[in-house]
């Protein structure tokens, strides 16, 4: 790519929903060759959004778009810097380093050739950086998934709240068998499908829009021998009953998306439904749980 000077703008906003609104609006407002967008969750659960422009944009217009999507405070807090002449698309990927977790390595396309042959690479583009594996919950889930798969292949696998599809892709690549991935957000379902295709498992990951366990697809695929759910503590507690009803005997469950102080209440909710804790991993203050159904 021809080297040109570029402009980087960044700001921090309160939550994932706001980050999605910003990235959606800016993505619609600029051509692919004009702008690269990356959004990353921070330890305090706020989101940092980085915008890399190939040429100096109309900054007043950019601030207006940010204000429209995320409010005046985010627009006012936006910082702007000039990046020396180089490949500005590559610059947008500098913070997206490969993340190892067990046998898996989550990476961007710029690191594709650097993944060791004894690892399973999961490629997620920076422009689709919601759930890239850089958050402690995703790394914890992948580590536990690697542990579970060493004990033998589950027959039926569900990734509930799939997001970008990282966990479903990991399971499909390791098992070479179909995996069901569901999400309440239609955009996430579309992203998961595309990521599965890019990772060579588009024919193995069935990504479906579904809320909770009410959709017919759960009965068609279940009961499940392995469920992965990297969502939030409250939904995990609320789903303990319907999830337990869709588990096969001796099924394993990997849960995350909860802060360490929230873990005990989630463990208690699933214990009441016949699931016992086998292992807990804490990464950067976030807990990932491995449970087994006992009855």
Curated annotation (Swiss-Prot):
InterPro entries: Ribosomal_L11_MeTrfase_PrmA, Ribosomal_PrmA_MeTrfase, SAM-dependent_MTases_sf. Its EC number is 2.1.1.-. Pfam families: PrmA (PF06325). It comes from the Bacteria. GO terms for cellular component: cytoplasm. One of its GO terms (molecular function) is protein-lysine N-methyltransferase activity. The lineage of its organism: Bacteria, Pseudomonadati, Pseudomonadota, Alphaproteobacteria, Hyphomicrobiales. SUPFAM superfamilies: S-adenosyl-L-methionine-dependent methyltransferases. It catalyses: L-lysyl-[protein] + 3 S-adenosyl-L-methionine = N(6),N(6),N(6)-trimethyl-L-lysyl-[protein] + 3 S-adenosyl-L-homocysteine + 3 H(+). It is found in: Cytoplasm. Belongs to the methyltransferase superfamily. PrmA family. Keywords: Cytoplasm, Methyltransferase, S-adenosyl-L-methionine, Transferase. It comes from Rhodopseudomonas palustris (strain BisB5). Its main location: cytoplasm. This is Ribosomal protein L11 methyltransferase. S-adenosyl-L-methionine binds at residues 138, 161, 183, 230.
């Amino acid at each position: 790519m021809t080297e040109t000077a570029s402009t980087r703008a960044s700001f921090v906003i309160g939550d994932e929903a706001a980050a999605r609104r910003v990235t959606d609006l800016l993505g619609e407002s600029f051509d692919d060759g004009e702008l690269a967008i990356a959004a990353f969750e921070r330890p305090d659960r706020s989101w940092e959004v980085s915008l890399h422009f190939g040429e100096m944009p109309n900054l007043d217009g950019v601030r207006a778009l940010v204000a429209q999507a995320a409010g005046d405070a985010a627009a006012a807090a936006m910082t702007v810097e000039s990046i020396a002449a180089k490949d500005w698309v590559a610059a947008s990927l500098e913070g997206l380093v490969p993340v190892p977790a067990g046998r898996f390595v989550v990476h961007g396309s710029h690191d594709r050739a650097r993944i060791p042959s004894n690892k399973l690479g999961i490629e997620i583009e920076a422009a689709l950086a919601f759930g890239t594996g850089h958050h402690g919950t995703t790394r914890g889930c992948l580590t536990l998934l690697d542990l579970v798969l060493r004990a033998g292949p589950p027959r039926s696998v569900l990734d509930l709240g799939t997001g970008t599809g990282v966990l479903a892709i990991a399971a499909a690549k390791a098992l070479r068998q179909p995996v069901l991935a569901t999400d309440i957000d239609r955009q996430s379902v579309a992203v998961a499908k595309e990521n599965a295709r890019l990772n060579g498992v588009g024919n193995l990951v069935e990504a479906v829009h579904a809320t909770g366990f009410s959709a017919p697809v759960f009965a068609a695929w279940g009961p499940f021998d392995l469920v992965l759910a990297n969502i939030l503590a409250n939904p995990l507690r609320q789903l303990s009953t319907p999830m337990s009803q869709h588990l096969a005997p001796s099924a394993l469950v990997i849960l995350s998306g909860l802060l360490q102080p929230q873990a005990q209440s989630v463990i208690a909710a699933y214990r009441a439904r016949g699931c016992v804790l086998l292992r807990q991993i804490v990464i950067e203050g976030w807990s990932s749980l491995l449970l087994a159904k006992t009855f």
